[in-house]
Amino acid sequence: MLELRLVQGGLLKKVLESIKDLVNDANFDCSASGFSLQAMDSSHVALVAVLLRSEGFEHYRCDRNISMGMNLGNMAKMLRCAGNDDIVTMKADDDGDVITFMFESPTQDKISDFEMKLMDIDSEHLGIPESEYEAIVRMPSAEFARICKDLSTIGDTVVISVTKEGVKFSTRGDIGTANIVCRQNTSVDKPEDATIIEMQETVSLTFALRYMNSFTKATPLANQVTISLSSELPVVVEYKIAEMGYIRYYLAPKIEEEDEAANYAQPAQNSAAAATSNNGTKKNEGNNKVDSKKRAIKSEFVDDSEAATDAQPQAKAKTKTEAGEDDDVEVMDTKPKNEPDDGDEVMETKPKTESNGEVEVMDIE
């Protein structure tokens, strides 16, 4: 039996509103420690992790671990029927196929209940390793949201650079360029208004603004946002939900064309077979370049070790062995569920090869 009673019903509404446009269907996992969700978007570029600890609920009963598949859009519709001050109670049987939402007004003069059918969603929990980041920026969440919104009127990508001078957000578009610099500022009346920068090394990464703007929908949940950056890892954008938990967004960086061409030059030279067509002629050199609008997910994004892979297989991005001379090459099938629009950015996934302990990526037609 599962029974959760949350006095701050409006908080659950805000959580759903902040993730429903990124993920359509997901499993909510309930255990003795709390109520959680982890899911990737359909393009396998972003991942969202939500945790609401059991201590934050007025009443929390979970007899055994249970996973409930839900359509987040439908769940958000039901929660919109609750007032911001209503008390929300969720109930589900261990082997049931529905979940019940009950909304009570603060004066308890109005009680509503809604039933929603659960879904059977085939997904697996991904391993996210604990990592040390080269730079961590803490700043007001409203300011970060405003920066992302303003830059999206100029371009469709943002370059986040952290140096001794501060953190710079830059973009470039058809009409021009924009640069916004935020310097460390701790001389404020309220701690949540401070901008704090912790830097081990300078870092500069490029991200899609449409994802960043989607992340900022969690702004009503927290006064501050924490942005963790490292050149070899996806960015982490975290909003703490008071003392109750958090929402964390992980986003793979975009790979610029000039960097990609340099990184792939050596592997291409060492793999003549990958650089020749079926008739033995070499492909055009331009084919080895990667479009700057395409992304690649780093290996750290979906798994923390080979052992974790055995215990927790990757979700959605299932692998298949390429039939050919080299049976060790694996190709990730990350085709989105729906065909992208003309303006959408499509991720191009590439096989990985080991070289001196580092993972290198190379283009294979």
Curated annotation (Swiss-Prot):
NCBIfam families: pcna. This protein is an auxiliary protein of DNA polymerase delta and may be involved in DNA replication as its carrot homolog, typical PCNA. The larger PCNA is perhaps processed thus bestowing on it exactly the same function as its homolog. It holds the Pfam family PCNA_N. Belongs to the PCNA family. GO terms for cellular component: PCNA complex. It comes from Daucus carota (Wild carrot). InterPro entries: DNA_clamp_sf, Pr_cel_nuc_antig, Pr_cel_nuc_antig_C, Pr_cel_nuc_antig_CS, Pr_cel_nuc_antig_N. It is found in: Nucleus. This is Proliferating cell nuclear antigen large form.
